[in-house]
Amino acid sequence: MRETQVNIDSEIGALNAVMIHRPGREIENMTPASAPDVLYDDILNLQLAEREHDQLTGVLRRVAAVYEFEDLLRETLADERMKVLLIDELVSLYGCEELAEELNGTENAELAAQLFQGTPMRKDSLEKFLSPLRHAIPPLPNAFFTRDAVMAVNERVIIGSMAFKARHAEALLLKSIFKYHNEISSDGFYYDGTASASQ
């Protein structure tokens, strides 16, 4: 991968690079009961979503460099300092600080996948045993809408202030990539919406 400089100065100009996320197990980890919590009316058909996404990706690859969100996250997690900061933000957001040590010890590719698919909740207390939730850090079935949480204007990035908690983790993951990935460079952030989400 060569270094990519963020530089968007037109809404209609040639597309040089795009970030995508292929739908995966996070779709299968939704249940009819949890679908409304992650802003869906119904369960998606994963095979259909994958097929349609692959068609779109095939078209995009003809005209632009295509970067996969999960791959960029895995590469970003190689920065141990960033990995600790990101995990601290996520466990704080979801109130599962007891998982921080385990997540920090997880291999980067596995952790990147897990952050999209969801981190299962340990049913190690009566409260958790009785909880209808299956995940301590929920799956991110909206992650393939990468344009929702981040925008670029010229050489700087805007990290969205997501209206729903179900989308906050996406913004945190994208912020980490644009701040710490050693081959994606920008001139910083115009706005970091994750700062207001964590308050």
Stretches found by the model and what they are:
Residues 1-199:
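The feature marks the mature, well-folded catalytic cores of soluble enzymes
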